């Protein structure tokens, strides 16, 4: 008898500290990619963390990082790799290699957290489709309506 262990995809959820909007996140990430290219360091979009996720293999099975912006999960990015790097002070870090494409999600309120949290597939919000993106309310209005229980 053979037993097959199927590893499920796990996602990361993290606060985008200091980020005001999805556009702000996009601009900052683009700036970082350009700066790294100019300095000849690399041409990838990376996000540095102190620790490598223990569930690395599950995250790398099509996992994403879901960004909390202003109290809501609003957007995600596919994690395409993880690399060990050395920081400026010689500290070992983990570079999450991200797909630059930001995919808007259904707004999902989330409490503040430190670091990241793992989330199963069922616990993360669905992506918005093109029609939903085009017809969606401005995020500030949608937030207000949600807080009032009207959405």
Where are the regions that the model predicts?
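Short, well-structured alpha-helical interface segments that form or flank functional binding sites
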Residues: 20, 61, 140
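Intrinsically disordered, low-complexity linkers and terminal tails enriched in Pro/Gly
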Residues: 2, 38-40, 130-133
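Short, well-structured hydrophobic secondary-structure segments
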Residues: 33-76
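Short, solvent-exposed amphipathic alpha-helical segments in soluble enzyme
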Residues: 30-31, 83
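Aromatic- and Lys/Arg-enriched surface recognition patch
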Residues: 77-125
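Short, extreme N-terminal leader segments that mark the start of a protein/domain
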Residues: 2-29
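A generic structural signal for short beta-strands and their flanking turns/coil linkers
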Residues: 11, 61, 92-94
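Well-ordered alpha/beta subsegment
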Residues: 114-151
